[in-house]
């Protein structure tokens, strides 16, 4: 160690550490008493230091190896000790310069501030203790100078106005001291004008910068008295702070504008969101506070509390204090100044550093003088704060109206219009183009003029081609050029006629000019074909048929192929307008026929391809036109006749045609777009390595398609269909939603919705979101309130447009009110219709509609802001305020996860990102201009910051990489040159650079070599759990190269298959790509071990980053495995990936439902399922190979992983996703599709059953293990899986049935025939399974034997505790299903014998009498008020539905009439003497069912009932034989009870009872007369012949033996009619695939005794190993321990420039490389409550002891999991508690907006079914044995709603 000055001693030795090196860091050393600092020495990394204090050798830990370090001290020798003194600058270099000598300064100080770009620093400070301190000197008051009015705007241009821009818009001033300002504006320095202050002001207050620096430092480490120290960069401001700031801000006096120019704020991303609105609302703020507020007794330097947080301004803080904002870092600046350069004149005042309370206290001394001014100023501040909007301009689709930008297009496109006019003028002046004849030599046209025509015509074509690049621009310019201007029309017509004239072309002297002339004409016709004005002018005025002229050229002999193709392009473009198509199709020679003939005669493939593109374009027009006609016919012109079969059939046919048109449009948008284009140099082949796209052809087709959509009013058709969706078939309704989603994925659809159909779009969004009216602007609401009778200028135009589109609007009807979407929104009603108050619907019923509405609203709003930004950027006057306002709004949209996704999708479309790239270039040029006057200064610009933020958002979150191909190189260079920008922008660019690293490889998007990408991924694996951006981007690029674009709903293969993707997949597979993907999945699953415990982290941005890695990994793995299995077929046996795929699914299951990555999680789940289904591709031929097939092995691995409590529910859900959904499924409209699907569905289920059969034992074990579960959610999901398994084939349903039966019997026998809780659970589990038709059939086939004996034994039990009662209730419910003939595999259209169908639906006929006896015996033995009694009566009622069961029931009642009458007496007595009970209504229903026959259902395959009891039998049944005659009849007693309790009795039961009394009375009348007389007519109507009925009851009806279960399976229905709006849960895929939410499970399914008390401590002692370290393992699982991996993994995102340090593994002692994670900012400084003393001097000592812990001791403590505290303690906060954030990334921004996100979640996520999956993954037609339908129905097993087959039952027995 080098010698130091004599007398110097070591004052301080310690290490400071920080998380990141990306920020300038500050640290403070405080000494216990004043000292002279003589030397500061930095200890390099690894350097050994021998110290005199205890502890021996220490090691340096300074990192990085080079940086600049500035030192500041509190100079106690200066007057009032108020100035920070610059002690010096050390340019640290570990090999050269490590110490700073300060012996010359001799400054007395008690604190040292360090500022530098370091992450860790070890330093030693030497000095001399002293006691000399200069006393403070009082100072006179300084007069307040007014602020100059000259202020510059954001672009640097001078604005001579009084409104002062807010501080956050201003840019930092250079720290130099210059001369006083002049009075002339031109003499101002630009940076002076930026701040509105002169250099005089700055010169006068030069020393006050140090005061502001110290106050800034002090504020950065102190908080309010009642709040704990918040985490670094996450200061939360309370309301008390807001009020305190308002009070303090009045002390600023006339220097309120002042702020530290050099230490300007290092804004976070959240800060930028607030900058945007400051200028907009600047008029609401007072420019300066009253001058009299300054204290007259003592001058005060300007308070700089606004030094850092823009949100600390009161108007932000009052409304947005709930946002978290990052604290800010200090900027680097020039700080070396000599004492001579400072003014030390008496006029320069100094003051001691005071606390905030002291400042406020000083104000109290002047209250008598300043009270009025203070109150007025505070009122101004509070009013401005109340009027200020929130920091984040949240877009709320349910509340905020959609907007469309209506800029001044004439001014915007004036240059293009003038250029076009100039070119035509030159053509007219320099050539003879009056007509074709004038172009010839005979009329004086020279050779030069003819050649000039070609030159100028090509220039004109170039300009027209430029116009055609933008649909809106082309239409506007041509409409302005030709609209009502005969001169221009005449000029263009003449030029076009000459250009298309073969004669004129032949007049060209040179052959080259002849060809150029013809090409010129073809191109001009193509470019001018979209103008209807010109087309009409040519036809009417010139009698010129442009189609005829083009075809004449086409058929000229020896015409070259290239020219023919160009002429066909002209024909193609001329068909963009309705007038062009009508003329083309209606000509003398039909144009369509001409094209067909040309195809027949064409010999070249390229010619045929171009001709068929014209045909397809005409078909597309016809389809869109027919949709408009059919929608008008269906919903506007038609009068609905209920029950009209012809009308229903016509509707089905029409809807089928609409579906075909929609499929054609979706096909044209994506999958087969190439077949609609006219690409250059394209040879159509079936397979090609790469199809080179032609942007011009794509743009031409896009323009044509948008024109077609507008001319055929597609949006109006969609609106009408959406409003009348109840009348649509399911497939049509879903096809319409698919089309809307497809349109929103393309820029053509978004442009159409915004530019051509905006009023209708607003109404569509309102319907999708379930709103009762379109949201309006507040201004519009006020206008409407003031002028209720006036037409609203904004919204009523929309309604008129909708009415014009519909012409004959339909009024809202009752039907529409029952729709699943918003009932009040429909086609607007006529004015004459009565005013019906709409019922407000705040939420949609269907989640898919809401998601579609949110997507549409965000994308339309994004287009509005993009248009506004583009117009403002191109305006002659660069208005940065307007730009920043719109950019802030679009930035705010990205604060919501859904809005962020939809916003970046729009940015990635149609080269929209170019808008922001151009803005960045423009801002860079402006900064270069500013730097001419102030070299080296980095200016701030909100426009630049927002533009960089939006590019960053696109880079981070946009999955489509078209933007990267276009702008990737520019973005990469921008990120590399981040140091040229101010720090806040530089930090964003540095983080963006990590994402852009893969683009450093040469030609990364070339398909020849993907090894650079594989290397990037391999390198990133070590840092996988930090979610590095380079890995995310590399995986996205690899996915782009290896997988063709996903085409939703693609049914036909593309025209030309590209082989490049398969080539990349082969390269990746050869480079161990499968293992690479498995490693990524394995590490993520290991990091989130026990994922249920990580749910809070998965809810945050950490979950988003996890999915950003997981999704492309799964997609690539699926592509590789699918291709490998397809190629190798049955020889592929690698099952390595299955375990990892299942674990990934478990991890995805535990993502919270409404997490930020919700859509990505669902997509990842689908990818896992589809990847597993790839193992079902091989076709096995024999039974032996079937047992070892890849399909069977995959199922075995999946079942094997359902191995623990945390895996039961997600494992069953995965199994449910893999298995086919139960039949029947919705019936397609097309009969041909129905036949195709039928065979495929049956074959698919047979194959699944065959491959599951070898795993029968494993399936049985799974059911046995989970069936007794008391957890309702698990039991519910297992029931669904069992139903899916049993639906496959007879062998699987028998497996499930036998497993359940064995479980029940074994449980009963094991418990010595005593019912147990476990048996009750199993019976309750079986109840629902027996109501499922396939399982009922198999259960009935094995019912005879011990299964029935179990039921009989349970029903015979007479001890009635809760367990027995519940068991008996379950048995009754099972018998209910067994006896219900409506639950059957037999279709209602079955042609078999009805008796045979009945035999299949009932238990074996020999068991039926025993079942009836057991039910009746149980009924008579239980209490009449018990629920079992009602269930037993219900089963007896079901027995009356068919003759066979009715016969045996009647025989039993005759045999046991005494018991029946005794039971009746008990029921009647209870109701007479105790209380009214519903069992008396059950008795009435039973008697009614015995005596009356219900009318048969319309469609039934079961035999009709013919038997019933007559009046005599009824009398025998209800009349007692041995009772007193004084007692009234039974029915009369029942009537008395019903009349007595009429208020609660059921009216239907009372009506039935009166009919029974009448029937009994008819029997008494017969007895009073002759016994041989016939019954009265009334009885004859009810019973045709009593005697015949009685006779029939003596003969048992015939019931044949039931068919086998295999035969029943073959006869079951495959399809059923399905209504998309029907409220039947079983008809949707969600019912089968989603676990039942716990909150929806009824209490009756979870009895109280099932909630078993449990002592977790005892359970842990029993189940866990005594040697297990629970605390340590818990920390390890939660990544809270100090293991070598954990600290690296705690950082949620990768830092830009990774730094590493050596850690020691506690177990092994070996060093381990790990990511460096530092302590929170502030070094654990205490935060005492404010006091009147000096905060700097009153802070308790924390780093002042020289013998303190060294960095190595810190690392040892940290590694062992300890929490070091004390003077150098880290006081680390785990990342889980601190929140998921790093630096300034977008994640911290979103995490910070907690209140905003919570509001959005409440708004978007309130319905419980909001996050339900949109449907089955099986909608993709290319999956193996997949189904294109996502909804399934099953009327055969859905159970009877009232328990009596297909006939309705009285409501009182529900």
Curated annotation (Swiss-Prot):
Phosphoserine-modified residues are 186, 258, 260, 276, 295, 301, 312
Biased composition annotated in UniProt, kind: Basic and acidic residues? 202-214, 236-259, 275-285, 325-343, 777-796
Bias class Low complexity marks the residues at 1738-1748, 1816-1838
Pfam families cross-referenced by the UniProt entry: VIR_N
Q: What is its subcellular localisation?
A: Nucleus
Which GO terms are recorded in the biological process aspect for this UniProt protein? cell differentiation; mRNA processing; positive regulation of border follicle cell migration; primary sex determination, soma; regulation of alternative mRNA splicing, via spliceosome; regulation of mRNA splicing, via spliceosome; RNA splicing, via transesterification reactions; sex differentiation
Q: Which UniProt keywords apply?
A: Coiled coil, Developmental protein, Differentiation, mRNA processing, mRNA splicing, Nucleus, Phosphoprotein, Sexual differentiation
Region annotation (Disordered) maps to: 202-361, 777-821, 1570-1589, 1720-1788, 1804-1854
- List where this protein forms a coiled coil: 779-808
One of the record's GO cellular component terms: nucleus
User: Where in this protein does the record say Phosphothreonine is found?
Assistant: 288, 297
Keyword Coiled coil part of the UniProt annotation: yes
Q: Which InterPro entries match?
A: VIR_N, Virilizer
Q: What's this protein's family per the entry?
A: Belongs to the vir family.
Can you state the subunit structure given in the record?
A: Component of the WMM complex, a N6-methyltransferase complex composed of a catalytic subcomplex, named MAC, and of an associated subcomplex, named MACOM. The MAC subcomplex is composed of Ime4/Mettl3 and Mettl14. The MACOM subcomplex is composed of fl(2)d, Flacc/Xio, Hakai, vir, and, in some cases of nito. Part of a complex containing fl(2)d, Sxl and vir.
What is the role of this chain? Associated component of the WMM complex, a complex that mediates N6-methyladenosine (m6A) methylation of mRNAs, a modification that plays a role in the efficiency of mRNA splicing and is required for sex determination. Required for sex determination and dosage compensation via Sxl alternative splicing: m6A methylation acts as a key regulator of Sxl pre-mRNA and promotes female-specific alternative splicing of Sxl, which determines female physiognomy. M6A methylation is also required for neuronal functions.
Q: What is this protein called?
A: Protein virilizer
Q: Which organism is it from?
A: Drosophila melanogaster (Fruit fly)
Q: Which gene encodes it?
A: vir
């Amino acid at each position: 160690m080098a010698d130091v000055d004599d007398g110097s001693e070591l004052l301080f030795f310690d290490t400071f550490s920080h998380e990141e090196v990306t920020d300038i860091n500050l640290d403070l050393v405080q000494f216990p008493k004043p000292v002279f600092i003589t030397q500061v020495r930095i200890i390099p990394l690894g350097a050994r230091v021998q110290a005199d204090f205890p502890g021996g050798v220490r090691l340096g830990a300074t990192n990085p190896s080079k940086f600049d370090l500035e030192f500041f001290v509190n100079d106690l020798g200066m007057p009032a000790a108020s100035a920070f003194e610059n002690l010096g600058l050390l340019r640290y270099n570990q090999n050269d310069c490590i110490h700073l000598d300060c012996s010359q300064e001799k400054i007395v100080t008690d604190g040292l501030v360090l500022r530098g770009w370091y992450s860790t620093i070890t330093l030693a400070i030497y000095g001399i203790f002293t006691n000399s301190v200069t006393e403070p000197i009082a100072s006179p008051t300084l007069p307040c100078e007014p602020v100059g009015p000259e202020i510059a705007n954001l672009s640097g241009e001078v604005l001579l106005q009084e409104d002062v821009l807010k501080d956050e818009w201003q840019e930092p001033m250079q720290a130099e001291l210059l001369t006083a300002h002049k009075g002339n504006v031109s003499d101002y320095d630009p940076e002076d004008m930026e701040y509105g202050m002169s250099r005089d002001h700055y010169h006068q207050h030069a020393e006050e910068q140090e005061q502001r620096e110290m106050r800034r430092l002090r504020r950065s480490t102190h908080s309010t008295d009642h709040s704990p120290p918040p985490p670094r960069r996450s200061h939360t401001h309370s309301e008390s702070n807001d009020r305190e700031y308002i009070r303090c801000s009045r002390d600023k006096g006339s220097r309120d504008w002042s702020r530290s120019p050099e230490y300007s704020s290092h804004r976070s991303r959240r800060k930028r969101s607030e900058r945007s609105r400051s200028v907009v609302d600047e008029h609401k703020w007072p420019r300066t506070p009253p001058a009299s507020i300054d204290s007259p007794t003592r001058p005060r330097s300007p308070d700089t509390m606004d030094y850092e947080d823009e949100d600390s301004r009161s108007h932000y803080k009052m409304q947005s204090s709930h946002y978290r904002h990052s604290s800010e870092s200090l900027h680097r600046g020039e700080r070396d100044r000599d004492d001579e350069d400072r003014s030390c004149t008496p006029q320069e005042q100094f003051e001691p550093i005071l606390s905030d309370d002291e400042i406020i206290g000083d104000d109290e001394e002047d209250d008598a003088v300043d009270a009025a001014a203070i109150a007025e100023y505070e009122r101004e501040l509070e009013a401005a704060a109340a009027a200020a909007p929130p920091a984040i301009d949240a877009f709320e689709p349910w509340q905020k109206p959609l907007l469309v930008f209506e800029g001044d297009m004439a001014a915007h496109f004036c240059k293009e219009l003038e250029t076009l006019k100039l070119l035509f003028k030159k053509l007219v002046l320099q050539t003879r183009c009056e007509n074709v004849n004038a172009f010839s030599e005979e009329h004086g046209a020279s050779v030069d003029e003819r050649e000039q025509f070609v030159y100028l015509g090509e220039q004109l074509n170039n300009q027209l081609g430029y116009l055609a690049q933008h649909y809106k621009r082309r239409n506007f310019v041509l409409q302005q050029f030709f609209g009502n201007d005969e001169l221009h029309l005449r000029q263009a017509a003449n030029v076009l006629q000459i250009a298309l004239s073969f004669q004129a072309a032949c007049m060209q002297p040179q052959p080259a000019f002849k060809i150029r002339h013809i090409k010129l004409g073809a191109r001009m016709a193509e470019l001018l074909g979209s103008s209807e004005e010109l087309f009409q002018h040519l036809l009417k005025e010139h009698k010129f048929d442009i189609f005829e002229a083009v075809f004449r050229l086409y058929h000229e002999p020896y015409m070259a192929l290239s020219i023919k193709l160009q002429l066909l392009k002209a024909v193609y473009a001329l068909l963009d307008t309705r007038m062009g198509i009508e003329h083309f199709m209606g000509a003398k020679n039909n144009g369509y026929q001409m094209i067909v003939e040309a195809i027949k005669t064409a010999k070249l493939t390229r010619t045929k391809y171009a001709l068929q593109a014209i045909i397809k374009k005409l078909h597309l027009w016809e389809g869109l036109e027919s949709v408009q006609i059919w929608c008008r016919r269906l919903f506007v012109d038609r009068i609905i006749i209920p029950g009209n079969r012809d009308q229903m059939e016509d509707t089905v046919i029409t809807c089928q045609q609409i579906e075909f048109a929609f499929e054609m449009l979706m096909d044209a948008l994506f999958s087969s777009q190439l077949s609609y284009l006219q690409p250059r140099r394209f040879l159509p082949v079936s397979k090609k390595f790469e199809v080179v796209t032609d942007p011009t052809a794509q743009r031409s087709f896009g323009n044509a398609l948008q024109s077609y959509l507008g001319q055929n009013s597609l949006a109006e058709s969609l609106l009408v269909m959406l409003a009348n969706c109840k009348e649509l078939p399911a497939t049509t309704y879903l096809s319409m939603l698919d089309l809307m989603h497809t349109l929103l994925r393309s820029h053509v659809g978004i442009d159409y919705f915004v530019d051509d159909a905006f009023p209708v779009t607003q109404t569509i969004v309102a319907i999708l979101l379930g709103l009762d009216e379109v949201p309006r602007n507040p201004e519009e609401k006020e206008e409407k309130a003031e002028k209720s009778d006036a037409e609203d200028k904004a919204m009523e135009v929309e309604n008129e447009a909708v009415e014009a589109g519909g012409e004959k609007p339909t009024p809202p009807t009752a039907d529409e009110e029952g729709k699943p979407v918003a009932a009040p929104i429909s086609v607007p009603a006529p004015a004459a219709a009565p005013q019906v108050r709409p019922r407000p619907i705040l939420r949609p019923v269907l989640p898919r509609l809401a998601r579609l509405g949110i997507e549409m609203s965000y994308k339309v709003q994004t287009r509005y802001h993009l248009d506004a930004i583009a117009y403002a950027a191109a305006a002659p006057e660069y208005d940065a305020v307007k730009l920043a306002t719109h950019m802030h709004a679009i930035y705010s949209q990205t604060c919501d996860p859904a809005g962020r996704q939809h916003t970046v999708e729009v940015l990635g479309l149609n080269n929209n990102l170019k808008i922001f790239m151009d803005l960045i270039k423009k801002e860079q040029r402006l900064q270069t201009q500013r730097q001419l006057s102030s070299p080296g200064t980095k200016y701030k610009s909100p426009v630049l910051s927002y533009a960089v933020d939006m590019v960053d958002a696109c880079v981070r979150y946009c999955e489509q990489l078209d933007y990267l191909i276009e702008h990737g190189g520019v973005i990469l260079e921008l990120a590399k040159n981040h140091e040229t920008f101010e720090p806040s922008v530089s930090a964003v660019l540095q983080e963006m650079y990590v994402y852009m690293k893969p683009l450093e490889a040469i030609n990364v998007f070339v398909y020849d070599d993907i090894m650079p990408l594989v290397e990037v991924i391999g390198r990133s694996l070590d840092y996988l759990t930090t979610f590095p951006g380079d890995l995310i981007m590399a995986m996205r690029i690899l996915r782009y190269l290896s997988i063709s674009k996903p085409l939703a709903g693609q049914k036909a293969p593309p025209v030309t298959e590209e082989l490049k993707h398969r080539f990349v997949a082969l390269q990746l597979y050869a480079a161990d790509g499968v293992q690479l993907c498995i490693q990524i999945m394995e590490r993520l699953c290991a990091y989130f071990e026990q994922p249920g415990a990580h749910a809070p982290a998965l809810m945050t941005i950490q979950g988003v980053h996890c999915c950003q890695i997981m999704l492309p990994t799964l997609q690539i793995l699926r592509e590789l495995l699918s291709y490998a299995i397809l190629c190798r077929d049955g020889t592929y046996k690698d099952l390595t990936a299955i375990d990892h795929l299942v674990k990934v699914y478990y991890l995805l299951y535990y993502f919270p439902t409404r997490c930020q990555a919700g859509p990505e999680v669902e997509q990842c789940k689908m990818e896992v399922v589809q990847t597993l289904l790839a193992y079902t591709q091989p076709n096995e031929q024999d039974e032996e190979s079937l047992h070892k097939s890849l399909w069977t092995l995959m199922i075995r691995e999946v079942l094997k992983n359902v191995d623990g409590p945390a895996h039961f529910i997600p494992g069953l859900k995965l199994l449910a996703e893999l298995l086919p959904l139960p039949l029947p499924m919705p019936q397609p409209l097309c009969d041909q599709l129905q036949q195709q699907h039928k065979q495929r569905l049956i074959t698919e289920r047979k194959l699944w059953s065959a491959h599951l059969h070898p795993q029968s034992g494993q399936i049985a074990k799974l059911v046995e293990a989970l069936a007794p579960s008391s957890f309702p959610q698990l039991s519910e999901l297992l029931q669904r899986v069992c139903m899916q398994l049993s639906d496959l084939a007879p062998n699987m349903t028998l497996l499930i049935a036998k497993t359940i039966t064995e479980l029940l019997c074994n449980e009963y026998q094991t418990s010595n025939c005593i019912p147990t809780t476990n048996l009750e659970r199993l019976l309750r589990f079986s109840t629902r399974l027996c109501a499922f038709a396939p399982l009922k059939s198999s259960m009935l086939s094995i019912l005879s034997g011990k299964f029935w004996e179990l039921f009989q034994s349970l029903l015979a039990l007479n001890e009635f505790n809760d367990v027995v009662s519940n068991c008996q209730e379950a048995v009754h419910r099972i018998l209910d299903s067994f006896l219900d003939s409506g639950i059957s595999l037999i279709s209602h259209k079955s042609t078999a014998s009805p008796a045979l169908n009945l035999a299949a639906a009932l238990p074996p006929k020999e068991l039926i009498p025993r079942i009836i006896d057991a039910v009746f015996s149980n009924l008579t033995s239980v209490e009449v008020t018990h629920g079992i009694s009602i269930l037993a009566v219900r089963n007896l009622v079901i027995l009356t539905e068919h003759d066979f069961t009715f016969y045996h029931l009647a025989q039993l009642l005759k045999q046991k009439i005494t018991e029946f009458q005794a039971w009746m007496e008990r029921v009647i007595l209870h109701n007479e003497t105790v209380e009214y009970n519903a069992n008396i209504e059950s008795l009435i229903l039973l008697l009614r069912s015995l005596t009356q026959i219900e009318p048969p259902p319309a469609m039934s395959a079961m035999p009709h009932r013919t038997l019933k009891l007559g009046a005599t039998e009824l009398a025998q049944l209800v009349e007692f034989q041995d009772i007193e005659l004084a007692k009234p009849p039974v029915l009369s007693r029942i009537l008395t009870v019903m009349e007595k309790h009429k208020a609660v009795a059921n009216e239907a039961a009372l009506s039935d009872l009166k009919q029974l009394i009448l029937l009994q009375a008819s029997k008494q009348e017969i007895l009073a007369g002759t016994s041989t007389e016939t019954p009265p007519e009334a009885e004859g109507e009810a019973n045709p012949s009593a005697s015949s009925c009685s006779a029939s009851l003596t003969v048992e009806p015939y019931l044949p033996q039931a068919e086998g279960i295999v035969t029943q399976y073959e006869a079951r229905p495959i399809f059923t009619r399905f209504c998309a709006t029907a409220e039947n849960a079983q008809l949707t895929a969600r019912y089968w695939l989603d676990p039942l939410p716990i909150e929806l499970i009824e209490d009756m399914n979870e009895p109280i005794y099932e909630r078993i008390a449990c002592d977790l401590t005892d359970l842990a002692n029993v189940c866990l190993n005594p040697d297990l370290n629970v605390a340590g393992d818990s920390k390890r699982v939660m990544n809270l321990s100090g293991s070598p991996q954990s600290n690296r993994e705690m950082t949620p995102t990768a830092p830009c420039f990774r730094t590493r340090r050596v850690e020691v593994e506690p177990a092994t002692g070996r060093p381990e490389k790990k990511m460096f994670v530092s302590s929170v900012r502030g070094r654990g400084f205490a935060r005492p409550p404010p006091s009147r003393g000096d905060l700097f001097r009153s802070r308790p000592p924390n780093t002042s002891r020289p013998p303190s812990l060294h960095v190595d001791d810190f690392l040892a403590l940290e590694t062992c999991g300890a929490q070091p505290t004390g003077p150098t303690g880290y006081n680390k906060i785990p990342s889980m508690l601190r929140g998921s954030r790093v630096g300034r990334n977008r994640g911290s921004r979103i995490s910070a907006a907690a209140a905003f996100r919570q509001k959005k979640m409440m708004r978007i996520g309130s319905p419980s079914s909001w996050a339900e999956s949109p449907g089955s993954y099986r909608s993709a037609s290319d999956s193996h044995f997949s189904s294109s339908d996502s909804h399934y129905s099953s009327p055969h097993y859905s159970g009877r709603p009232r328990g009596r087959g297909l006939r309705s039952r009285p409501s009182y027995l529900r």
